[in-house]
Amino acid sequence: MTRRYWNINLKEMIEAGVHFGHGIKKWNPKMAPYISAKRKGTHIINLARTARFLSEACDLVFDAASQGKSFLIVGTKKRATDLVASAAIRARCHYVNKKWFSGMLTNWSITKTRLSQFRDLRAEEKMGKFQHLPKRDVAILKRKLSTLQRYLGGIKYMTRLPDIVIVLDQQKEYIALRECAILGIPTISLVDTNCDPDLANISIPANDDTMTSIRLILNKLVFAICEGRSLYIRNH
């Protein structure tokens, strides 16, 4: 994996509040190597470690994107839904930002069937086929389509399992991480001071509660993916 410079600087991370962890009573002892201090009852994350692992993650996604690999971004925290969608669309990644359904990856054959139904319904609506149906049937189909769009809209073009999964909240997306571990899919995860850094292939110690922190980390990763995609296009 080629090491590159991703313009990750301390001042920017401090301004975004990346260094603020949880209260000292809520910590996971496995996070001790990533904590630099305690301040007013709160653990402070070591930003030198954040920069190191964020840089490693950027290198990984750049290399993967330059080879045409696919990505899935998972972040179902309500405040982050729009951020996840816009970042994923910008980098041409799949995303889940509403709810992670258990078995979404491990029961891929079922997920694939649902996605096929979703695409068929969208096509039928666009072609005007709903117009020839009774109003009651149209209402049922539109409700079904709306539900599918809400929960599967971010993965509607996903035809196979992703090559890399990026998780923005380890505790909230624990099931997604476990499914990736079972399937051997590499994962990148933000880990706050109450998380387990051993659950992902690359764990980035960072505040996973503040939007400015999540945005900064995600934007760095998305930039690296976009750079990798550009290289892939130039070479093909």
Swiss-Prot record:
It is found in: Plastid, Chloroplast. The keyword Plastid applies. Keywords: Chloroplast, Plastid, Ribonucleoprotein, Ribosomal protein. Its main location: plastid. The keyword Ribosomal protein applies. GO terms for molecular function: structural constituent of ribosome. Pfam families: Ribosomal_S2. One of its GO terms (biological process) is translation. GO terms for cellular component: chloroplast; mitochondrial small ribosomal subunit. InterPro entries: Ribosomal_uS2, Ribosomal_uS2_bac/mit/plastid, Ribosomal_uS2_CS, Ribosomal_uS2_flav_dom_sf. PANTHER family: 30S RIBOSOMAL PROTEIN S2 PROKARYOTIC AND ORGANELLAR, SMALL RIBOSOMAL SUBUNIT PROTEIN US2M. Belongs to the universal ribosomal protein uS2 family. This is Small ribosomal subunit protein uS2c. It comes from Agrostis stolonifera (Creeping bentgrass).
